[in-house]
Amino acid sequence: MTTKVRVHIRQIRCEAFAAEADATATMYLASRRMLMPGVRNPHTEAETRAWMRDVVFTRHSVRLAEVDGEIVGVASRDGVWLMNLYVKPGWTGHGIGTQLLRAMLANAASSTPVPRVSTFARNANARRFFENRGFRAVGTGDGSANEEHEPDSRYERSTRDVS
């Protein structure tokens, strides 16, 4: 059963940049471990934290989901690609992922081509999430294009409206 909670979707706060990057990396790592067991992380925890701070938070358009001051989700976009959409374990099923996706699509410039996302083929929850929100499968990969070497599924959608 999906329960809606009061979620605040926002941008990164410059004055809290380092702390937010660290909290987001903690949430991201926990989410990957819990929701994608068996998918290896090719980086150490320190490397992942540096990537969140130095790449995701500085080069991508980022939105954070917050409940009562706690970061419970993150989404980032680089051009047409939705690069990350993670919800903290224990917070899935509350509409947070949908709200983050909606914010990312609304944030995309009107001239941005069709939004795209790639998921690991074994991540049935992510595939179902995007398919239920209007994304359609347009291709697969054998894993040679990602650091995890996991087969993937690529999706795109023709509209930015998310129900």
Where are these regions (language model features)?
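Conserved active-site alpha-helix within GNAT-family acetyltransferase domains
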Residues: 98, 122-139, 143-148
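Conserved acetyl-CoA-binding loop-helix of GNAT-fold acetyltransferases
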Residues: 87, 93-106, 127-132
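A short helix-loop-beta-strand connector motif used in the catalytic cores of GNAT acetyltransferases and
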Residues: 53-64, 81
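A short, internal acetyl-CoA/4′-phosphopantetheine-binding micro-motif in the GNAT/acyltransferase core
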Residues: 82-93, 119-120
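Conserved GNAT-fold acetyl-CoA-binding loop/helix
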Residues: 29-52
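Conserved GNAT acetyl-CoA-binding A-motif
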Residues: 108-121
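Conserved beta-strand in the GNAT
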Residues: 64, 70-86
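A short beta-loop-alpha structural element at the N-terminal edge
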Residues: 6-26
